[in-house]
A protein has these predicted regions:
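N-terminal, polar/charged subdomain of small-to-medium soluble alpha/beta proteins
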Residues: 1-96
Length: 96
């Protein structure tokens, strides 16, 4: 399950749908993964859109933060990194 929280602003439906699609793809890579918490916030600098993804897989908490000019860009980067970490953790688990 994907839980989205936006700090100090209201995310529109288009952004929420985008997050569901991008982050939802990550869920299929690990069966026993916990919920994915997505936190959106605005920063005072040029790359002012911040995205934080948090989830738990057995034996490890995963937290990825990315900043970009748009939320879509930050979500894409964070989801890609999360996917890589999950795949690595899964490979490590099955290598034992």
């Amino acid at each position: 399950m994907i839980n989205v929280k936006s700090l100090k602003f209201n995310a529109d439906e288009k952004l929420l749908d985008f997050i569901e699609k991008k982050v939802g793809k990550v869920e299929k890579f690990f069966d026993n993964m916990g919920d994915i918490d997505v936190t959106l916030s605005l920063l005072p600098d040029a790359e002012n859109k911040s995205v934080k993804l948090q989830t738990h897989i057995p034996g490890e908490d995963l937290i990825i933060e990315r900043n970009a000019r748009t939320f879509e860009e930050a979500v894409t980067e964070a989801a890609d990194v999360l996917k890589e970490k999950i795949v690595r953790a899964k490979e490590k688990k099955f290598a034992k």
